[in-house]
């Protein structure tokens, strides 16, 4: 794990994160649908995209490989986001609670983070709903860059708590 971390440090030093913009979507449900809606909107507006999530790795809506995880390893995320430097406008990804908790978003820059919803799930891994919610919150407190935009569902369980954490970082905020 330390070697893995050192490799990522070296990669980031030699080649900073490449996409012009990066969007990460988290939530109990709706991550895949939301990322695909975004990718389709981008396609029809001639925005070059890369997408990773439950359905695999995609460049401009064409599948390039399968993925066994919703959020691949941080090395896989980093390499895919930085591949093909030309036409690298937007990187869209699904941010799972496991991936966030395990630091798979370390070394990635996220410009826009969104949470679709939050309900009891993955308690076999997280043990408590609070721990599960805290892992989702990492997208906004640790991963989203300081000039980033947070998009929050106003009907979210723990909405006020999420809102207070986001406001404490002075992030731009959009609610729906």
How would you name each of these model-derived features?
Residues 89-98:
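Switch II (G3) loop of P-loop NTPases
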Residues 76-83:
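Conserved alpha-helical scaffold flanking the Walker A/P-loop in AAA+ ATPase domains
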Residues 19, 86-87, 101, 110-176:
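Acidic, Mg2+-coordinating active-site environments of NTP-dependent enzymes
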Residues 98-106:
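Conserved helix/coil segment N-terminal to the catalytic DExD/H
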Residues 10, 25, 52, 77, ...:
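Residue-level signal for inorganic ion chemistry
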Residues 64-72, 121-126:
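Flexible beta-alpha connector loops of hexameric P-loop NTPases
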Residues 1-26, 33-46, 170, 175:
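Short, basic phosphate-binding NTP loop
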Residues 46-59:
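Short beta-strand-centered segment that lines the nucleotide-binding/catalytic pocket of NTP-utilizing
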């Amino acid at each position: 794990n330390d070697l893995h971390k050192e490799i990522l440090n070296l990669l980031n030093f030699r080649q900073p994160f490449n996409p012009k913009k990066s969007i990460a979507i988290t939530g109990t449900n709706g991550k895949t649908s939301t990322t695909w809606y975004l990718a389709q909107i981008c396609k029809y507006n001639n925005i070059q995209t890369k997408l990773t999530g439950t359905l695999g790795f995609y460049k401009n809506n064409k599948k390039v490989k399968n993925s066994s995880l919703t959020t691949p390893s941080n090395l896989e995320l980093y390499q895919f986001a930085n591949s093909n430097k030309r036409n690298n406008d937007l990187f869209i990804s699904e941010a799972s609670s496991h991936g966030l908790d395990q630091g798979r978003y370390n070394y990635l820059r996220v410009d826009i983070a969104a949470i679709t919803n939050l309900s009891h799930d993955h308690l076999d891994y997280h043990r408590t709903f609070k721990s599960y919610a805290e892992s989702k919150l990492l997208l906004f407190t640790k991963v989203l860059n300081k000039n980033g935009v947070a998009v929050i569902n106003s009907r979210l369980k723990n909405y006020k708590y999420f809102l207070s954490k986001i406001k404490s970082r002075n992030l731009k905020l959009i609610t729906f």
